[in-house]
């Protein structure tokens, strides 16, 4: 099993690589790529950790050596948010990066499962899809926007508010991966009750959690460590699924188009990627209104990505 981390010298990439070096199954290969010359050094540093995961680092303009033979590709390359920026401000730089990486993946490892972390995810995933379609290698079962951070934040914040064990809390999160498009289904959290005020405040906090970290870091970065943890959780889920385990995770995928062509929802993962898109259950009136209210934004985000590749 080979996992490639693209953008491995960045804050998310280094955190993700550290976690994967410790947690991938024994015998796995971990490839790190970044345009930054430090990347082989990141791999050298991590290679001193005593686990049965081989690691190599590659720098420069061409990600091909890292991508060759990859089963899973996790893309965190791009610029990070700074105070005053929203995820859309990242588009101008990150769209081109994701497009060029998808073009290489289409040639080098077209059968890999691809997890896109690079923001704005609502838009970068459709960009990758359009590139892969043009190359004739698109498989919607194998392209994912990683929204796991919204899930782990929701689990953490609910556990804090209600005095629960965060490892036991399960919160479905649907929609997209920015602002109002992030919709935690708090009505479905088992074993806890929320007041209307708590639901409104908690939903807003989950939607704005990225901004909370950007502002707290005061210009020194964005949510890199928690995102590394979230990406590791999703990456390991893909690895387990490819090895034959049945795994359920939330991800931003091309679905049946009921609300938008791409939508974050629960998926059953298997050896070919998405085996089944699962229903997300009944919504409360608050959640129905929030879903209706986000769709224009989400569909617009998707269209921007499609148009970028035309």
UniProtKB/Swiss-Prot annotation:
Protein name: Malate dehydrogenase
Keywords in alphabetical order: NAD, Oxidoreductase, Tricarboxylic acid cycle
Record keyword Oxidoreductase present: yes
Disulfide bridge partners, by residue number: none
Catalytic residues of the enzyme: 177 (proton acceptor)
Entries under Pfam families matching the protein: Ldh_1_C (PF02866), Ldh_1_N (PF00056)
PROSITE patterns per record: MDH
Enzyme Commission (EC) number: 1.1.1.37
A GO molecular-function descriptor: L-malate dehydrogenase (NAD+) activity
Segment forming the signal sequence: none
GO process annotations (BP): malate metabolic process; tricarboxylic acid cycle
Family named by the database record: Belongs to the LDH/MDH superfamily. MDH type 1 family.
EC class: oxidoreductase
GO cellular component, one term: cytoplasm
Catalytic activity: (S)-malate + NAD(+) = oxaloacetate + NADH + H(+)
Record's function text: Catalyzes the reversible oxidation of malate to oxaloacetate.
Positions contributing to substrate binding: 81, 87, 119, 153
Presence of keyword Oxidoreductase: yes
Quaternary context: Homodimer.
InterPro entries xrefs: L-lactate/malate_DH, Lactate/malate_DH_C, Lactate/malate_DH_N, Lactate_DH/Glyco_Ohase_4_C, Malate_DH_AS, Malate_DH_type1, Malate_DH_type1_bac, NAD(P)-bd_dom_sf
Organism of provenance: Vibrio vulnificus (strain CMCP6)
Binding site for NAD(+): 7-13, 34, 94, 117-119, 227
